[in-house]
Design a protein with these regions (language model features):
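Hydrophobic face of alpha-helices
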Residues: 13, 17, 37-41, 112, ...
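Acidic/His- and Gly-rich active-site-bordering loop/insert found
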Residues: 2-101, 106, 110-126
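Divalent metal-coordination and catalytic microenvironments
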Residues: 23, 62, 75, 105, ...
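Metal-dependent amide/peptide-bond hydrolase catalytic core
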Residues: 46, 212-389
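Solvent-exposed residues in well-ordered beta-strands and their adjoining turns
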Residues: 65, 78-80, 135, 190-194, ...
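Non-cysteine beta-strand/loop elements that form the S-adenosyl-L-methionine
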Residues: 74-76, 187, 344-350
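A structural signal for isolated positions on well-ordered beta-strands in alpha/beta enzyme cores
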Residues: 52, 131-133, 289
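Histidine/acidic-residue-rich, glycine-tolerant segments that coordinate divalent metal ions
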Residues: 60-61, 82-84, 88-100, 107, ...
Length: 389
C-alpha cells in the first residue's frame, strides 16, 4: 500500500514519535494531566498560537489565526491514561506505577502537536481559524463536558477528532457518517429476598434464583425487543451475593453495562429493564431496585463532515480509506458532536506483523505501529488545507 505522507509531517516524524513516547513514559489519569498540559502549553506557545490553560480543569487550547473572520475548525485530542500496570517490554514503558497509556491518547496528543507545528509555520496560508483542543479525562470522567462548560466551542463551526485504532491495520482510515461509537451506560440491580436454611427453601425468597431469572430475562431485550440490524448490548459483568453453601441468600447485587448506537434503543433498553424487573418482582415476591446511570451518549458523525474528511483521507491512504471497524465502546467526543457538526474517525494502528485485535485497547501489553502517527497527522493537515486554503 502506497501512502502519501505529508512532507512536512515526514520531516518531523522523529519528533512526533519521540513526543508520543515521552507522554507514554509518564502517563497521567483524568484531571491529573499536569505534566502533559505543561508540555503541550510550552510547545503551542513556541509555535506562536494563542494558548489558554485550565480549560475543563486540566485541558489546554491553542488557537491559530484567532482573529480571522473566516471559518473556525476545531481539532481535538484526549490526554488521559488508564489505571493499568503496563506489562509490555518497551524502552518507553510507563514509569508511573499502575498507570498506563493503554488506549492511544499519548499518540493523539503527539499527532495534534505535530499538526499544530506544521500549520503554524505558514499561518497566512490558512484562510480561517484552527482551534486545537487538548481534552482531559475522556476515560469515564466526561472531560468534554467540562470544556464545553468553559466555552471551548464558542465560535467553532465544526469539530473533528480521531482515535488510533488497533482493530484496523496501519495504512487505513475508518470514517463514516452516522453513529460510530455507542452510548455507554451502567446499571446496578439490587435484589432483596428472604434468607433461610438451604434445607427449608419454602420459607424463603431466594435472591440467587431471582437473580438468575433477571439475568436471562434481560438478554431478551437485545434478542427480542431491538432490531437485530441495530447493534445493542446488555451485559451483566458482576454478581455479588450469598454467604455459605447451605444458606439461601437474602440479597444479590448485579452490575452491568448497556450499549446502543441510537438514542431510541438506549431509551428502549432502559424502559424494558424497568418493566422486566417490575414483573419479576411480582412473580417472585422479591424487592428489586434498579439504579441506571447514563454514560456517554452515542457519537454520531455529521454526514457532510464525514464526507469531507473521507475525501481528505483518500488523498493520504488511497483505497485504505473506508468503513471503520466499529465497536460498542463509548467516547465523550459525543458531547462535542452533539453541540457542533463534527466527525470522529479511526486511524489503523495495529502493530507491525500482528493481526488486528492482537493487542487490544485497555490491555496491559497495548502498543501501536508508530507509523500510524504520521498517517493521522497527515490526514489532519490535508483536511485543514482542503477546507481552509
Amino acid at each position: 500500500m502506497t501512502l502519501n505522507i505529508c512532507p512536512e509531517i515526514n520531516a518531523i516524524s522523529n519528533e512526533i514519535i519521540s513526543t508520543r513516547r515521552d507522554f507514554h513514559k509518564y502517563p497521567e489519569l483524568g484531571f491529573n494531566e499536569h505534566r502533559s498540559a505543561k508540555i503541550i502549553t510550552k510547545k503551542l506557545t513556541a509555535y506562536g498560537l494563542d494558548v489558554e490553560t485550565g480549560v475543563g480543569k486540566t485541558g489546554v487550547v491553542g488557537v491559530l489565526n484567532p482573529k480571522h473572520t473566516g471559518k473556525t475548525i476545531a481539532l481535538r485530542a484526549d490526554m488521559d491514561a488508564l489505571p493499568i500496570q503496563e506489562m509490555g517490554d518497551v524502552e518507553y514503558a510507563s514509569q508511573n506505577d499502575g498507570i498506563m497509556h493503554a488506549c492511544g491518547h499519548d499518540g493523539h496528543m503527539a499527532m495534534l502537536l505535530g499538526v499544530a507545528k506544521v500549520l503554524s509555520e505558514k499561518p497566512e496560508h490558512i484562510n480561517g481559524t484552527v482551534k486545537f483542543i487538548f481534552q482531559p479525562a475522556e476515560e469515564g470522567y466526561g472531560g468534554a463536558k467540562y470544556m464545553i462548560e468553559d466555552g471551548v466551542l464558542n465560535g467553532v463551526d465544526e469539530i473533528y477528532g480521531a482515535h488510533l485504532w488497533n482493530y484496523q491495520p496501519h495504512g487505513t482510515i475508518g470514517v463514516k457518517s452516522g453513529p460510530v461509537m455507542a452510548a455507554a451506560d451502567l446499571f446496578t440491580i439490587t435484589i432483596k429476598g428472604k434468607g433461610g436454611h438451604g434445607a427449608t427453601p419454602h420459607g424463603t425468597v431466594d435472591a440467587v434464583v431471582v437473580s438468575s431469572h433477571v439475568i436471562l430475562a434481560l438478554q431478551t431485550i437485545v434478542s427480542r425487543n431491538t432490531n437485530p440490524l441495530e447493534s445493542t448490548v446488555v451485559t451483566i459483568g458482576k454478581i455479588n451475593g450469598g454467604y455459605n453453601f447451605n444458606i439461601i441468600a437474602d440479597n444479590v447485587v448485579l452490575e452491568g453495562t448497556a450499549r446502543a448506537y441510537t438514542e431510541k434503543n438506549r431509551q428502549l433498553i432502559k424502559t424494558r429493564m424497568h418493566e422486566i424487573l417490575t414483573g419479576l418482582s411480582i412473580a417472585f415476591n422479591a424487592e428489586i431496585s434498579l439504579e441506571y446511570e447514563d454514560g456517554y451518549p452515542p457519537t454520531v458523525n455529521d454526514k457532510s463532515c464525514a464526507e469531507k474528511l473521507l475525501h481528505s483521507a483518500t488523498k493520504i491512504v488511497g483505497a485504505g480509506a473506508g468503513e471503520p471497524y466499529l465497536s460498542m465502546g463509548g467516547e465523550d467526543f459525543s458531547y462535542f458532536a452533539n453541540e457542533k457538526p463534527g466527525c470522529f474517525f479511526f486511524i489503523g494502528s495495529s502493530p507491525k506483523d500482528q493481526e488486528p485485535l492482537s493487542t487490544p485497547h485497555h490491555c496491559s501489553h497495548f502498543d501501536i505501529d508508530e507509523n500510524a502517527l504520521l498517517v493521522g497527522s497527515s490526514v489532519f493537515v490535508q483536511f485543514i488545507r482542503d477546507q481552509l486554503i
